Each structure stands twice: as C-alpha cells, then as structure tokens.
Amino acid sequence: MDAQGDAGAQGGSQGPRPSNKRLQQTQAQVDEVVGIMKVNVEKVLERDQKLSQLDDRADALQEGASQFEKSAATLKRKYWWKNIKMMIIMCAIVVILIIIIVLWAGGK
C-alpha cells in the first residue's frame, strides 16, 4: 500500500478522528465551565466587598443611633427639670398672690 492508501484507511483525509472530536468538545465544555466559574468567583468577591461595606455602614449607623439616644435622654431630663422649676415658680407666684389678696382683704 502507498502512503495515501494508509492515510485514507486511517481516516486522515476525512478530518479528526471521533475520539479527538469528543475530546475537543469536552475541552470546550471544560473551558466554558472554567470561564463561568471565574465569573462566579469574581461576583462572590464583589458581593463580599459590598457586604463588608454595608456592615461597616450599619455599625456606623448603630453608633450614631446610640449617641442620639443618649443625647435625647439627656435633653429630656434637662427639659423635665426646666418644666418642674417653672411649675414651682408658678406655684410660688400663685401662693404670693393669694397671700397678698388675703392680707389686702383682711386689712380693710
């Protein structure tokens, strides 16, 4: 047999052998899966970074809320005492007015 006959018998002129074609298809599928997995890993890393930033912002908001709560409680106490002082002053003025009226009415 000549070289062409051997090549024709082996299927060299007909293209790749079926096992090579299957191997190429499998390799293409593996490459596709690897590409998809790389994209997924990148997305997971981005998500982790965003979650970390969100956690930091939540901590800052919690700290701000705690400070606001303390300030509000302090302010509430301050105005409660101012209100009590005003009530005491009003009562003292009313008592003084009653005493003045009683003394003025009793002096006649």
Swiss-Prot record:
Residues 1-85 are cytoplasmic. GO terms for biological process: defecation; nematode larval development; regulation of hindgut contraction; regulation of nematode pharyngeal pumping; synaptic transmission, cholinergic; synaptic vesicle exocytosis; vesicle fusion. Gene3D superfamilies: 1.20.5.110. Residues 1-25 are annotated as: Disordered. The chain crosses the membrane at residues 86-106. The keyword Coiled coil applies. GO terms for cellular component: axon; cortical granule; plasma membrane; presynaptic active zone; SNARE complex; synaptic vesicle membrane. Pfam families: Synaptobrevin (PF00957). Keywords: Cell membrane, Coiled coil, Cytoplasmic vesicle, Membrane, Synapse, Synaptosome, Transmembrane, Transmembrane helix. Residues 22-82 form the v-SNARE coiled-coil homology domain. It is found in: Cytoplasmic vesicle, Secretory vesicle, Synaptic vesicle membrane; Cell membrane; Synapse, Synaptosome. It is a single-pass type IV membrane protein. InterPro entries: Synaptobrevin-like (IPR001388), Synaptobrevin/VAMP (IPR016444), V_SNARE_CC (IPR042855). One of its GO terms (molecular function) is SNAP receptor activity. Involved in the targeting and/or fusion of transport vesicles to their target membrane. Acts in neuronal exocytosis of synaptic transmission. Likely to have a role in cholinergic transmisson. Required for viability, coordinated movement and M3 pharynx motor neuron function. Belongs to the synaptobrevin family. Part of the SNARE core complex containing CBG09569/SNAP25, snb-1/VAMP2 and CBG03570/STX1A. This complex binds to cpx-1/CPLX1. This is Synaptobrevin-1. It comes from Caenorhabditis briggsae. The gene is snb-1.
